[in-house]
């Protein structure tokens, strides 16, 4: 079998472009260089901030960031995304690398994400992209839709005593004696029940605008935190409408008062109780609100299908925040491509 040459690669890439490589649209629409200063301030050591071109240079930070975006877009592990970049010309091109260039390995990518996670930088990069969305004309419009979805992590097989110690914020003594076991235990994830099913992991609380279905703010907590507990952190004055849409989990007299005091208009579903069923007017109001509120479910559905699922395989809430934040960013990037395609039609 002959070796793939430069012109062979160029011909294959041209054929991919002719077929419609979706990564080319993403590459064109994302302002990659606008992220550089913040990323390099976190990931480069003083020795890597070189004043000359002598010696071996570190891997470009934007190449690694592009690789994280690829990973989130396709729900790949570190090892899988390394393999796919080596194997697929479209992935290599997305990184702006040639067939002769070295590809970051899985360990390098893991270390890069660790630095971003510990610095809390993913949230800032998400906000920077939101500024780019507004600059392109996609300001938050039509009201704020709030909701939360469970993000599972691999189940922990702990004894009852171990679970009680973790809930109390303690580390079981047996784990101290087995450092390898301790490293594999997620002490931040929690169990919760939804629709009669038990889940272990975290929650992705989001605020999406009703007009564009773009995520504008998000918060990551353990799965046991009630949806309504993060409402204050999610709401923003940046939407052109004062309407706030949410399911009945966000309904309480206290929340209604807070919304009014902050100048928001509650469009939160009214909940029926055992003693008080909904009036016809309340049921009609809920139906009308559902026509808009249901759009936030499209966000989670897209993350589940187009982005390959929501499960994360990290340990600890710091890493979970980074992975979930990257998933939210990847959703907004893909959504921008869709909005631009609709606008051009």
What kind of feature is each model-predicted range?
Residues 229, 254, 275-282:
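Short, charged, surface-exposed secondary-structure boundary motifs
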Residues 49-56, 270-278:
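Arg/Lys-rich, glycine/proline-spaced intrinsically disordered segments
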Residues 31, 55-63, 101-105, 288-292, ...:
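Secondary-structure capping and boundary motifs in well-ordered enzyme cores
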Residues 24-69, 73, 103:
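Basic, short loop/linker segments at the boundary and entry of helix-turn-helix/winged-helix-like folds
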Residues 56, 79, 83-86, 95-100, ...:
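Polybasic low-complexity intrinsically disordered regions
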Residues 1-44, 338-345:
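Charged, often Cys/His-bearing segments associated with DNA-binding zinc-finger transcription factors
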Residues 262, 284-345:
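Basic, amphipathic alpha-helical segments enriched in Lys/Arg and hydrophobic/aromatic residues
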Residues 262-270:
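Short hydrophobic/aromatic-enriched beta-strand-loop microsegments
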């Amino acid at each position: 079998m002959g070796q793939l040459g430069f012109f062979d690669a160029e011909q294959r890439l041209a054929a991919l472009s002719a077929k419609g490589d979706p990564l080319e649209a993403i590459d064109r629409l994302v302002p990659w260089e606008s992220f550089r200063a913040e990323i390099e301030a976190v990931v480069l050591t003083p020795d890597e901030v070189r004043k000359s071109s002598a010696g071996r240079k570190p891997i470009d930070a934007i190449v690694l960031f592009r690789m994280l975006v690829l990973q989130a877009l396709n729900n790949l592990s570190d090892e899988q995304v390394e393999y796919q970049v080596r194997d697929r010309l479209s992935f290599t091109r997305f990184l702006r690398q040639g067939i002769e260039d070295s590809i970051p390995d899985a360990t390098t990518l893991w270390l890069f994400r660790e630095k971003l996670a510990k610095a809390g930088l993913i949230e800032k990069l998400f906000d920077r992209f939101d500024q780019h969305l507004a600059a392109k004309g996609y300001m938050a419009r039509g009201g704020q839709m709030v909701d939360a979805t469970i993000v599972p992590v691999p189940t922990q097989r702990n004894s009852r005593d171990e679970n009680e110690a973790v809930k109390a914020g303690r580390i079981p003594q047996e784990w101290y004696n087995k450092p390898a076991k301790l490293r594999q235990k997620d002490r931040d994830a929690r169990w919760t029940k939804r629709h009669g099913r038990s889940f272990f992991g975290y929650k992705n609380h989001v605020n999406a605008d009703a007009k564009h279905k773009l995520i504008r703010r998000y918060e990551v907590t353990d799965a046991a935190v009630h949806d309504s507990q993060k409402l204050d952190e999610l709401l923003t004055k940046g939407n052109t409408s004062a309407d706030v849409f949410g399911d009945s989990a966000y309904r309480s007299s206290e929340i209604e008062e807070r919304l009014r005091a902050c100048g928001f208009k509650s469009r939160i579903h009214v909940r029926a109780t055992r003693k008080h069923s909904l009036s016809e007017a309340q049921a009609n109001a809920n139906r009308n609100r559902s026509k808009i509120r249901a759009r936030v479910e499209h966000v989670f559905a897209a993350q589940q299908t187009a982005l390959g699922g929501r499960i994360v395989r990290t340990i600890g809430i710091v890493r979970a925040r980074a992975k979930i934040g990257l998933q939210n960013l990847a959703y907004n990037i893909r959504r921008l491509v869709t909005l631009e395609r609709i606008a051009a039609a």
